[in-house]
Design a protein with these regions (language model features):
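Long C-terminal subdomains/extensions of small-metabolite kinases
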Residues: 1-171
């Protein structure tokens, strides 16, 4: 499960409405939709300043931010392994912030995110928490598990105490 504000959410928003997705899905090339939309959004979205505050009160301010995502699993839409250390069983949220990079560097880093290799580069910040508030200097697209939540300048994410139990048939 993930939620994000900025570039990743803008991609989710656009993928939901583009006719390109249905066409590429019919060709079994649906993941290319994310690539095409990501390239377009990378060229048009303006980086912002964001403040990330965790439950401990620790506050970090980032400039020229493309996006911040909060995840409890490794992968986000299109197969991006944005938070390689994330686990659905560790009672922690993983945060990735992508900032202080040129558009060209973001473009070059995106393919490395499929394998989780992007974490080695400057401008990629990872953290963990149980609760976080993210504030942007202007309203940006927000998604929750790939579903658009419209434009927001503040989001608050926390873990619920109860866990979802799923019953599946035995083979």
């Amino acid at each position: 499960v993930s939620t994000g504000i900025g570039f990743d959410a803008a991609v989710c928003h656009q993928v939901m409405v583009t006719p390109l997705k249905a066409f590429l899905n019919r060709l079994k090339l649906g993941k290319l939709t994310y690539l095409g939309v990501a390239l377009h959004k990378l060229l048009t979205l303006k980086p912002v300043t964001m403040t990330v505050t965790t439950e401990t009160g620790e506050t970090k301010t980032y400039h020229k931010v493309y996006f911040t995502a909060v995840m409890n699993l490794k992968y986000e839409g299109g197969g991006f392994n944005f938070c390689p250390a994330a686990s659905g069983t560790d009672d922690r949220l993983d945060i990735i912030t992508v900032s202080e990079l040129t558009r060209l560097k973001v473009l070059c880093l995106l393919p490395t995110a499929f394998k989780g290799w992007h974490t080695r580069f400057r401008g990629i910040t990872l953290d963990t928490c149980t609760e976080v508030t993210i504030t942007s200097d202007r309203a940006l697209p927000v998604h929750t598990d790939g579903e658009p939540v419209f434009l927001q300048s503040d989001i608050h994410v926390h873990l619920e105490k109860e866990k979802l139990r799923i019953i599946t048939p035995c083979k």
